[in-house]
Amino acid sequence: EDEFVEIFNLSSKLIKQKQKDAVIIMAGAAGMFPENKKFWKSALPKIKDNFDVANIHHITPPEGKCDKDMWVGDISKLLKKLSIQKPIWVTEAMIGKCKVIPMYVNAFANGAEVIIDVGVNAPGMKMSKKSRKKLNEFIKEYDNFITIKKLSKTKVEFIFKDGSVKSLEF
């Protein structure tokens, strides 16, 4: 951990020195399993002043285990507990056989501002063509929302810049 913190802080400071408007993304937390939480609980306070965006990865393991919100709820709670206020991005979303729409909706509802899908050519467990189609339709319909409000376990409202609202049951 000490080496990570030292390298991260020095690198971030150097990048900001050379490119003042650079956006520094926290090194990707690969899930929030107990050992990950322990590491980040200790490391985050030591690097918090040297990154702009917190991020998390959700890579579905071979057995296909899915997290309900791509670990966003866990990283969000940890950031709050540590009094760190940063936007959250999912920078490697590989959902494999998980239910695509509930995972994306729950990730956004729990604080993700950006979700970057690994794409169809990434190694590992692939999303089905049917799920990929659903995701593309979801993006087309709900992209550029400014707020998401959870109405129930399976219903949300997306609020857009122009004030319009779209509901989604999933």
Task: Enumerate the predicted regions with their spans.
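Noncatalytic carbohydrate-binding groove/subsite architecture in carbohydrate-active enzymes
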Residues: D2-I101, N110
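Aromatic- and carboxylate-lined catalytic core of secreted/periplasmic carbohydrate-active enzymes
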Residues: K97-F170
